[in-house]
Amino acid sequence: MRRAICPGSFDPLHLGHCAVIRRATLLFDEVVVAVSTNPNKTHRFSEAQRIELVREVFADDPAVVVEPLESGLIADYAERRGAVALVKGLRNGADYDYELPMATMNRSLTGVETVFLPGEPSLLHVSSSLVMEVAALGGDVTSFVPPEVLRALEDE
């Protein structure tokens, strides 16, 4: 089985994330969506809430497994999970410049490859932080997040 890890905080999960995850399932037998918690960030949703939301959105796809990202190096986590690759979505050159050194380091540590998937053109402007900002200011984020996430945002 060819397994890939798609790591991220997914706070909140948006349609750009969903597109990358769905496309990754076309390349790999299993995609582990590893939900991380950054201690240096304030998260809108708890780790448990984010995991549940991702599970709800991908409930119809048996190739998607959702779990918390263990602390430590992502390269070590990928090795423990038997993953052949990490999958990262890229919206622009700045994302590439940010991700490339990490991809190179991960490969040098354990040999895990990183597969970069370009973002969907219609979603290149979407980020979790922008979704949160627009939602906090009362804007309509319907076209940026899955219905499950929209409901969770409205319930907050």
Curated annotation (Swiss-Prot):
The keyword Transport does not apply. The keyword tRNA-binding does not apply. GO terms for cellular component: cytoplasm. Keywords: ATP-binding, Coenzyme A biosynthesis, Cytoplasm, Magnesium, Nucleotide-binding, Nucleotidyltransferase, Transferase. It catalyses: (R)-4'-phosphopantetheine + ATP + H(+) = 3'-dephospho-CoA + diphosphate. Pathway: Cofactor biosynthesis; coenzyme A biosynthesis; CoA from (R)-pantothenate: step 4/5. InterPro entries: Cyt_trans-like, PPAT, Rossmann-like_a/b/a_fold. It is found in: Cytoplasm. Its main location: cytoplasm. The record marks H17 as: Transition state stabilizer. It comes from the Bacteria. ATP binds at S9, F10, H17, G89, L90, R91, E99, L123, L124, H125, V126, S127, S128, S129. Its cofactor is Mg(2+). It is an enzyme of class 2 (transferase). GO terms for molecular function: ATP binding; pantetheine-phosphate adenylyltransferase activity. Substrate binds at S9, K41, I74, K88. Pfam families: CTP_transf_like. Its EC number is 2.7.7.3. GO terms for biological process: coenzyme A biosynthetic process. Belongs to the bacterial CoaD family. PANTHER family: PHOSPHOPANTETHEINE ADENYLYLTRANSFERASE. Reversibly transfers an adenylyl group from ATP to 4'-phosphopantetheine, yielding dephospho-CoA (dPCoA) and pyrophosphate. Homohexamer. This is Phosphopantetheine adenylyltransferase. It comes from Kocuria rhizophila (strain ATCC 9341 / DSM 348 / NBRC 103217 / DC2201).
